[in-house]
A protein has these predicted regions:
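Alpha-helical scaffold segments in soluble metabolic enzymes
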Residues: 17, 43-46, 138
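Catalytic core of nucleotidyl cyclases, primarily class III adenylyl/guanylyl cyclases
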Residues: 99-131, 145-171
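Transmembrane alpha-helices and their extracellular/periplasmic helix-loop junctions
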Residues: 1-38
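Juxtacatalytic helix/coil linker segments
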Residues: 24-111, 151-156
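Amphipathic alpha-helical segments that line or abut small-molecule/effector binding pockets
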Residues: 130-137, 141
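Glycine- and acidic
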Residues: 17, 77-80, 120-121
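Hydrophobic alpha-helical packing residues
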Residues: 92, 96, 139, 143-146
């Protein structure tokens, strides 16, 4: 007789816990999944904790943009078989994106070998310009080391050009 209320309470607890997981936390899981490939885990956490930080319709604010491009990429594509080039490019881009996320950047897009990165969107950052420049310096160092490592293997991997610009944008 004493176990009946305890068992009933446990069943209620686990039912409510299951409901929360299935219904209430569903939105948080969706946000994590939607943004995890584009922005750093810390920014994803902020968005999940306060989804109101995202506004639809766009707003005008100062942002820093970073652009990368591998010089001679077309020649590199023509000179190497896709089985050789694809893993190299994936490894290179993964390394570059890791650096972007370390600096709190948002990956806007990847076009072939080029990356476009934003700082201060979707969440505003007071130090976005500094983050962009520091990120660019780290990416440049990574890209130079990566290119040298590939050259040592006999693969001509082009030099990465990195550009940074700060200005007003609608985000």
């Amino acid at each position: 007789p004493l176990l009946d209320p305890i068992v009933g309470s446990l069943i209620t607890f686990f039912t409510l816990l299951g409901y929360r997981f299935m219904v209430v936390d569903k939105d948080k899981r969706y946000l994590r999944k939607a943004f995890s490939s584009y922005i750093s885990p810390n920014l994803v956490k902020q968005i999940v904790e306060d989804p109101k930080t995202l506004t639809l319709g766009g707003r005008r604010q100062e942002c820093t943009f970073l652009f990368t491009d591998i010089s001679g990429f077309t020649t590199m594509v023509e000179a190497n078989h896709p089985d050789v080039l694809t893993p190299l490019l994936n490894e290179y881009i993964d390394g570059m994106i890791e650096i972007v996320f370390e600096h709190g950047g948002t990956l806007d897009k990847i076009v072939g070998d080029a990356l476009v990165v934003m700082f201060s969107a979707p969440i505003e950052m007071a130090d976005h310009a500094e983050r962009g420049v520091r990120c660019a310096a780290r990416m440049d160092a990574f890209a130079d080391a990566y290119s040298e490592a590939q050259k040592a293997k006999g693969i001509a991997f082009g030099h990465t050009r990195v550009g940074v610009n700060t200005g007003m944008a609608v985000v």
